[in-house]
């Protein structure tokens, strides 16, 4: 002790005692960390949805500023003019003349070739157009009409139904899914091909696809009659919903049959059938009363227009360099039908035996692919009928579905180039980067094949022209995409049976 006192360096230490309450506050303040919102938490579903919708609307508006199909390209223009022309026809002519060739309705100039609900929808838009500016829908003289105000109206007419028909069932599905991941949720809602086709090229696919998604939601929740009515509405908006008709029919039939109560099963099926027939009659009543129903059917199912349009990634186009050497003209429609049924049969068989929700989703996607690959009069846009049900499988088959969605984006690029919207490639590439940066597992083989697809797209833009084969790059894209689609169809067909073994 004496030594310490002698040591001048040593000084007594005094400890200041803090107020206990104050010290607790200091400790709590130091230990307090910045709050981080966990978007994967179920309680934050609304925040995730709002965030995605804000990004989605920005994308739609940005896409809408780009050229539309056939912009300033007389005499036929494009799909944008087709939609405007149908408003012109329906609002100016009596209903019995909508599908008939006549003085004021030249069917060779974008004649109406979709079912009645499409016609009714365009009549409603035509009435609104007529009230805003009569020049937009003046009979004959409005052909090829283009203006900034009219383009704004048309673009909004495609965006609004997306939020009314398409998004609600899709959001309902994902927000109630136990496996819902925010990134997968975002990838599903921001799927580029639908946005580019509806808001760029210009169509109203979101209406029929939204009705289809609503059909799925109601059928899987055992509201069979409502689901059946909604599907009839989807089918009568766009006849391409026939792609989904077989799985919908098989699912309803399989779930309605009860071996222990055959009479009740028969009564249930009969009731559903009556509602379906009744809905069809109501929709078609004006054409039945005017005796023009047959003319509508002829326009809606144009078997004389060939197996495909443009350079589409269907089997018939992709392998045309072989098929055109075979004498198939007289039997091609029968071969087409047989191939569609063969491609659909495996998943449909399992669906009938095991009508689970997952198998329903698999069958909808597989059958959609089978129709796209092998059916009659296929367009690039019809790949959406396989892609949208695939969105419902993104949680279960993440790697496969993300690969598939990226290939579908590549498959429609030739259509975008035709519309002078090559900038869409940047959107597709951004989607590819995000989809593989934030999801797992990442398969190198998938990434490499997608990069090959992008290389083909770049060649289509900047590659040297070939006078002998002027469409070589478009055909390369079609072949590349078609081979992938065949693989996806086979994979889903085998996946159906694997599920059967487990169950």
From Swiss-Prot:
Main location: endoplasmic reticulum
This protein's record includes keyword Protease: no
Catalytic activity: an alpha-D-Man-(1->2)-alpha-D-Man-(1->2)-alpha-D-Man-(1->3)-[alpha-D-Man-(1->2)-alpha-D-Man-(1->3)-[alpha-D-Man-(1->2)-alpha-D-Man-(1->6)]-alpha-D-Man-(1->6)]-beta-D-Man-(1->4)-beta-D-GlcNAc-(1->4)-alpha-D-GlcNAc-diphospho-di-trans,poly-cis-dolichol + a di-trans,poly-cis-dolichyl beta-D-glucosyl phosphate = an alpha-D-Glc-(1->3)-alpha-D-Man-(1->2)-alpha-D-Man-(1->2)-alpha-D-Man-(1->3)-[alpha-D-Man-(1->2)-alpha-D-Man-(1->3)-[alpha-D-Man-(1->2)-alpha-D-Man-(1->6)]-alpha-D-Man-(1->6)]-beta-D-Man-(1->4)-beta-D-GlcNAc-(1->4)-alpha-D-GlcNAc-diphospho-di-trans,poly-cis-dolichol + a di-trans,poly-cis-dolichyl phosphate + H(+)
Name the UniProt record assigns to this protein: Probable dolichyl pyrophosphate Man9GlcNAc2 alpha-1,3-glucosyltransferase
Membrane-related topology note: Multi-pass membrane protein
GO-annotated cellular components: endoplasmic reticulum membrane
Enzyme Commission code: 2.4.1.267
Function in brief: Adds the first glucose residue to the lipid-linked oligosaccharide precursor for N-linked glycosylation. Transfers glucose from dolichyl phosphate glucose (Dol-P-Glc) onto the lipid-linked oligosaccharide Man(9)GlcNAc(2)-PP-Dol.
Family: Belongs to the ALG6/ALG8 glucosyltransferase family.
GO BP terms in the entry: dolichol-linked oligosaccharide biosynthetic process
Positions on the Cytoplasmic side per record topology: 1-46, 173-181, 233-239, 290-332, 380-382, 442-443, 496-503
Class of enzymatic activity (EC top level): transferase
Compartments where located: Endoplasmic reticulum membrane
Keyword annotations from UniProtKB, A to Z: Endoplasmic reticulum, Glycosyltransferase, Membrane, Transferase, Transmembrane, Transmembrane helix
Lumenal side: 68-151, 203-211, 258-268, 354-359, 404-420, 465-474
TM region positions: 47-67, 152-172, 182-202, 212-232, 240-257, 269-289, 333-353, 360-379, 383-403, 421-441, 444-464, 475-495
Keyword Transmembrane: yes
Pathway listed: Protein modification; protein glycosylation
Pfam families reported for this sequence: Alg6_Alg8
GO molecular function terms listed in the Swiss-Prot or TrEMBL record: dolichyl pyrophosphate Man9GlcNAc2 alpha-1,3-glucosyltransferase activity
């Amino acid at each position: 002790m004496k030594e310490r006192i002698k040591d001048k360096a040593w000084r007594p230490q005094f400890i200041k005692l803090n107020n206990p309450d104050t010290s607790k506050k200091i400790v709590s303040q130091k230990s307090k960390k910045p709050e981080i919102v966990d978007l994967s938490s179920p309680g934050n579903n609304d925040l995730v949805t709002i965030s995605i919708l804000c990004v989605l609307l920005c994308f739609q508006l940005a896409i809408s500023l780009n050229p539309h199909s056939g912009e300033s390209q007389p005499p036929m223009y494009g799909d944008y003019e087709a939609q405007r022309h149908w408003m012109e026809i329906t609002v100016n002519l009596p209903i019995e003349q909508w599908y008939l060739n006549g003085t004021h309705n030249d069917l060779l100039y974008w004649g109406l070739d979709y079912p009645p609900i499409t016609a009714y929808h365009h009549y409603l838009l035509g009435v609104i157009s007529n009230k805003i500016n009569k020049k937009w829908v003046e009979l004959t003289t409005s052909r090829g009409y283009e203006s900034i105000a009219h383009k704004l109206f048309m673009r909004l007419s495609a965006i609004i139904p997306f939020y009314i028909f398409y998004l609600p069932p899709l959001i309902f599905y994902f927000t109630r899914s136990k496996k819902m991941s925010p990134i997968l949720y975002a990838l599903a809602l921001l799927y580029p091909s639908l946005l580019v086709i509806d808001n760029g090229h210009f169509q109203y696919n979101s209406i029929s696809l939204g009705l289809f998604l609503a059909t799925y939601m109601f059928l899987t929740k055992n509201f069979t009659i409502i689901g059946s009515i909604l599907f009839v509405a989807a089918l009568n908006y766009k006849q391409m919903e026939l792609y989904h008709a077989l799985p919908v029919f098989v699912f309803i039939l399989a779930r309605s049959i009860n071996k222990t109560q055959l009479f009740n099963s028969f009564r249930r099926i009969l009731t559903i059938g009556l509602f379906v027939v009744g809905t069809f009659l109501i929709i078609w009543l004006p054409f039945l009363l005017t005796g023009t129903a047959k003319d509508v059917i002829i326009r809606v199912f144009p078997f004389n227009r060939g197996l495909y349009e443009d350079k589409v990634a269907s089997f018939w186009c992709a392998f045309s360099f072989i098929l055109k050497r075979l004498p198939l003209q007289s039997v091609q429609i029968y071969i087409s039908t047989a191939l569609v049924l063969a491609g659909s049969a495996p998943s449909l068989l399992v669906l009938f035996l095991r009508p689970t929700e997952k198998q329903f989703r698999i069958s909808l996607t597989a059958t959609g692919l089978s129709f796209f690959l092998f059916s009659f009069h296929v367009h690039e846009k019809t790949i959406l009928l396989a892609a949208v049900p695939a969105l419902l499988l993104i949680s279960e088959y993440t790697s496969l579905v993300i690969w598939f969605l990226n290939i579908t984006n590549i498959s429609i690029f030739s259509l975008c180039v035709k519309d002078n919207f090559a900038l869409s490639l940047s959107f597709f590439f951004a989607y590819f980067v995000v989809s593989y940066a934030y999801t797992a597992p990442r398969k190198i083989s998938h990434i490499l094949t997608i990069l090959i697809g992008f290389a083909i797209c770049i060649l289509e833009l900047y590659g040297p022209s070939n006078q002998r084969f002027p469409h070589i790059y478009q055909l390369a894209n079609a072949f590349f995409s078609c081979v992938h689609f065949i693989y996806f169809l086979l994979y889903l067909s085998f996946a159906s049976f694997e599920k059967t073994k487990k169950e």
